[in-house]
């Protein structure tokens, strides 16, 4: 469990450095994150944790701390960096990071958990993430948005 989560959450580490293009940073790392949580291995672990939580109450907390909380922290750090740079105007980076990460997956994670259908194609994942990132940036940009 720890090894799997380390390998997936490690993909978020470059995000903390902060590139010049926020939209591309968030899209690139968000697509990698979504691909990771939708992998067969991740879905199997998540299903197992949910199934065994009653017998092993600490398992859910451990999974949450090693997975989602680390992802939220990585995104929050990035948002704080962009906020300090004046690129983003957000009141609560921690809350915003959680909301942004959850919006990236939309219904895809729930569908994958429950419907057991084919995984989305990589280009579909990127399109899904790019849309969520654009919506996020319209609300969080410190610059006036250009007319579209």
Positions of the model-derived regions?
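Helix-loop "lid/cap" segments that line or gate small-molecule binding pockets
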Residues: 16, 31-38, 46-54, 135-139
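Membrane-interface starts of transmembrane alpha-helices
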Residues: 89, 93-97
């Amino acid at each position: 469990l720890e090894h799997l989560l380390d390998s997936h959450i490690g993909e978020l580490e470059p995000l903390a450095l902060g590139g010049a293009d926020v939209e591309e940073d968030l899209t690139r790392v968000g697509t990698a994150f979504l691909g990771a949580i939708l992998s067969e291995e991740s879905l199997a672990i998540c299903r197992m944790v949910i199934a065994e939580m009653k017998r092993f109450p600490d398992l859910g907390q451990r999974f949450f701390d090693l997975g989602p909380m680390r992802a939220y922290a990585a995104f929050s750090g990035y948002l704080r960096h962009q906020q300090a740079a004046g690129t983003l105007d957000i009141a609560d980076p921690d809350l915003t990071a959680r909301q942004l990460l959850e919006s990236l997956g939309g219904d895809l994670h729930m569908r994958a958990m429950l419907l057991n259908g084919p995984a989305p194609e990589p280009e579909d994942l990127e399109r899904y993430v790019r849309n969520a990132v654009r919506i996020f940036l319209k609300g969080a940009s410190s610059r006036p948005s250009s007319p579209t």
